[in-house]
Amino acid sequence: MENGGRPSVGQVILLTTSSAITALFYSIYRHKYRSVQTLKEAKKFCLTDDLPAVLSDLPGKCVPYAVIEGAVTSVKEVLNSQYVENCKGVIQRLSLKEHKMVWNRTTHLWNDHEKIIHQRSNTVPFDLAPENPGESGVSVRVLRPLEAVDLGLETIYEKFHPAVQSFSNILGHYMTGERPKGVQETEEMLKIGATITGVGELVLDNKTIKLQPPKDGMLFYLSSMDYEGLLEKQEVQMRWWRILSIVFGVASCITLFFILRRKYRHYKEKQHLKNLQREFEESRARQRVQQEPQNKEEVQNPCSICLSTEKSCVFLECGHVCSCISCYQALPSPKKCPICRNFIDRIVPLYNS
């Protein structure tokens, strides 16, 4: 068999790459799975007047992972939008994103490329209060909101500034392989009165209830969706990572199957050649016994390759008889008939009378 039954370079690369990607995707899937499970097990609290009493009765006056839904209210000062009048919030994020086309030397195509060239986030202290203004209840102070993985910001301003094009610039773009399209300016805010779902550690500290990033690797959420929508979103992401893990895992198994099949075929061919060798040796022994040593003459029907041994095998499927077993074994892989140059699928012994 070609390469002595060893896998090809392409098979090795494919197996290594697919196995590594499978391990990576499975690790992400397990992380998502644990996050979904902890989110399902999180305790849900309402912003009622008895919440401080409930927390004071708990060990450490805290809940390691809790769900709170409420409206955003400022503690003291607020942030004003730079571009939209009368738009106030507690978190502001200003971004400048560069859009350009990059020449791909492999596919010979221009591909879209985005890059954040500047981003600034501002925040002021804020609380989560009951959604209805006249409703009685307590407020929860949100700490370190920028550490949330799902920060429910709303895009309130967006403007694209196209790049100025000239003939000299176009020539330079083709020489450098980069063609700027423009800069996109964006402002996002968490506005006053917005309803968000906070998931994190709930702590009672000096009569102040605080929601802060949880410990033990659990995720901190400040999402604009409700709890059910947030949970469904995380489950969808988890399922996608599971599907990707299965797809690349199947690709790894298929590649491994072809590699093992090649090894097995090589092993079967070696066994077949050993059996043929044994049959040829037995045939030669019988011929030597039948012939009189003293009446030896020149070799009849000699091998077309070495001319010193009788032809002893038939090549299939072409049917040519032109070689001894030793010369057949010496043929390079893949083995071809010396006469017609067709591939040799198998051989059968030739018994000379």
Swiss-Prot record:
GO terms for cellular component: mitochondrial outer membrane; mitochondrion; peroxisome. Pathway: Protein modification; protein ubiquitination. InterPro entries: MDM2_MDM4_MUL1 (IPR051652), MUL1-like (IPR022170), Znf_RING (IPR001841), Znf_RING/FYVE/PHD (IPR013083). The chain crosses the membrane at residues 9-29, 240-260. It comes from Xenopus laevis. The gene is mul1. GO terms for biological process: mitochondrial fission; mitochondrion localization; positive regulation of canonical NF-kappaB signal transduction; protein ubiquitination. Homooligomer. E3 ubiquitin-protein ligase that plays a role in the control of mitochondrial morphology. Promotes mitochondrial fragmentation and influences mitochondrial localization. Inhibits cell growth. E3 ubiquitin ligases accept ubiquitin from an E2 ubiquitin-conjugating enzyme in the form of a thioester and then directly transfer the ubiquitin to targeted substrates. This is Mitochondrial ubiquitin ligase activator of nfkb 1.
